[in-house]
Amino acid sequence: MGPCVRFLSLWVGLLCLVSGEVCAQVAHVPPPSRATIPLANIPRVTRAPKLEDYLEHRAREAELKVMDFRQYIPGDGIPASEPTTAYLSYDEKNLYVVFVCHDAPGQVRAHLSPRELLDQDDGVALYLDTFLDRQRAYFFFSNPLGIQEDGIYTEGQGLDTSFDTLWYTQGRVTPDGYIVWFSIPFKSLRFSHAPEQTWGIALYRVILRKSEYDFWPYITQRVQGLAQQFAPVGGLEHVSPGRNMQFIPYGLLAGDRFLNQPSPPNPSTPPAFQSVFEHRAGLDAKFVAKDALTFDVTLNPDFSQVESDDPQVTVNQRFAVFFPEKRPFFIENAGFFQTPVDLFFSRQIADPQFGARMTGKVARWTVGALAIDDRQPGLNQPPGSEYDTRAVDGVVRVAREFGKQSYIGMFASSRDFADTSNRVVSLDGRVTLSQNWVADFQAAHTWTRQDINLPQLCLQFNAPTQTGPNPPNSASQQGNSLFADATYAGRHLNFTTNYVDYSPGFCAELGFIPRVDIRQNNATASYLWRPKSKTIVDFGPVASETVDWDHVGTLQDWATAVALQVDLTHQTTFQLSRGEAYELFDNIPFRKHSTSFMVTTAPYKWLSLNGRFTTGTGENYFPAAPLAPFLGNVKRLNLGFTLRPFSRFRFDETYIYYRLGNREGSTPSGYASDSSIFNNHLMRSKLNYQFTRELSLRLIFDYDATLGNPQLLDFQTNLGSYDGGPVPPAKQFVTDVLFTYLLHPGTAIYVGYNNGLTDLNLDQTLLPPQVVYQRATNNSTSQLFFVKLSYLFRF
């Protein structure tokens, strides 16, 4: 750890030496005054405003006019560099917001894109804290052409853009900027049934070429969180979501041909190509009670054939790799069930048929409950056996707010499958200590009963020894976890430290807990200078550390890293970092290091780039038998770019390279230094053409190849199988074609085709037929064609 401390000291000293004048000028600048924001009232109108009213300067009814936008980044409270005016009004059914944004001719970044694919665009947004609880808010964003993105912002969790609702936008680029019109139905919001509403509101604008983010009212990084800084806005009288019911039936027709390899292998059912025609129908229904509680019921939840997981390295990974949820039923209102520790990860529910969920807010109480089944655990069980059934899962979450942006909550989950069960209970909370300090905590306990003859879902399970004439078929265990975190957030200094403890018997089957039997401390600190410069947004050092032990006191890992980061305009970031680490794996100690350089930039409206190169050392976690894990030389390269040559077209390219080479003094004898143990290549080419706001075409080409030395690498384990299990492809090329007609969330038509070429071949000259590798990646082992339709009925 000593070299990293010296490295950090060197960087800090060097920074202050070369920029001492800047440090002196910037570090002690007092914050701008933040006067108490008076309550503003939104006028009620009898005629809805239209976009043309602002384009043609027509006379309009009374509106709440907002002009004083202030910088959040790069400045803190200084006037926005480009003028913005917002106009707010409402009628019986809708809230209206119109943004008139001035900008230099030809400088506006706007593309005709799919909904929520707006990372390359300027835009405006509205935050709505409808319960004025300073904890969460709706987020409505539009680019200058009226393309939408929406989400839920929650203090401590950030912005969750999986939330989708029905609202309306129009946008137009003008010679001196752009104008965007919002119409948000009250039916799309949840709020109290008081006769007069007072909400927290923030208006937002982003100017990407300047890396500038503006707010009204003045919101500062000197204060922890956003919601407590929103402006109170009233005058909303006699509004209500009304009777709010919605039904989304969907239908799916699909033809699927694939190479089926039973797991575990069974001589009576050898590998074979299978063709399946599927027709599925389902229904999602939603009911709102007392304007605040939402009840969702689902039958055959909509699976996410239209979404595709982003490429991630899965080779030579000690712990499970996290892939986010994509299914609509689970991603909606997912934040209600989120806690500091990931006790609920809905991807653990693989194949549900029925489900019901309640989420909402009553006074200062936030509640969530979910009950759902899962057919997947019983799929391969003998017909009529005890385990030829389905699992039943339940989750309950309740939280009570107190003070200012603080809460205490309870979480409980249950999973039952035949005579096996898993129970989790937890207490967690968040306490705002000052305008900069916040603390989070969580304690959980689990009870687990497992059949020792079934695959175990716990990371560690102490099965009883099979002795005697009647050995037990099941066993039970309990476990605990603790989490505590303290975070300081400011404009220059940011610091967080936490402690995590999982006992050996801790098991949350519905959660994502990649490791147990650890006591771990993590800390991260950064200090950023923010000079008054036209190009430099901020710069400064970043440092982090991690150390953990098991529950008998054996040191398992430590890691420390320091970095220099520079942020410029045009969304440009440079970072140079150095890391040192120790890891105990398979009772073998390893000392590691890494050096990394990262850059991201979007210099033009039509181009953005990102890249990271890392070199160092790392373990071969799963070598070929009978070798023990050993240290090798690591090289990693992540490259990506986005091209937008014209408004309707977008091309994204991603390349990930991961190489582990032999290292002199560490690799088993007989292998040349730095010769390859494996090379992993992942490439994704993604093209999107937007014919209209509703109709689009998406093409994805994925290539994944793991080229390795079978004498040094256990291919079965590294490619996701096991010794004697199904044969995994070492090389695959997947083509994904999707036509989408999305009128609005809930109403859509999808037509898709997927074809996977691999290096696997079914050799039917053998008895029984076997799957073998071939040299070329030209054998289609999976094909899927589907048509999916859904329609939103709203009452």
Model-inferred region functions:
Residues 1-6:
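N-terminal secretory signal peptides that target proteins for export/translocation
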Residues 8-21:
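Bacterial N-terminal signal peptides
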Residues 24-401, 409, 419:
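Structural preference for beta-rich elements and adjacent junctions enriched in aromatics
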Residues 93-95, 136, 178, 195-199, ...:
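Outer-envelope beta-barrel architecture signal
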Residues 218-241, 377-425, 431-432, 573-637, ...:
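Outer-membrane beta-barrel transmembrane domain signature of Gram-negative proteins
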Residues 240-295, 393-468, 540-542, 600, ...:
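Surface-exposed extracellular loop regions of Gram-negative outer-membrane beta-barrel proteins
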Residues 269-273, 317, 346-349, 382-389, ...:
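Alpha-helix capping and helix-loop boundary segments enriched in small/acidic/polar residues
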Residues 351, 445-795:
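Exposed, low-structure sequence patches enriched in small/polar residues
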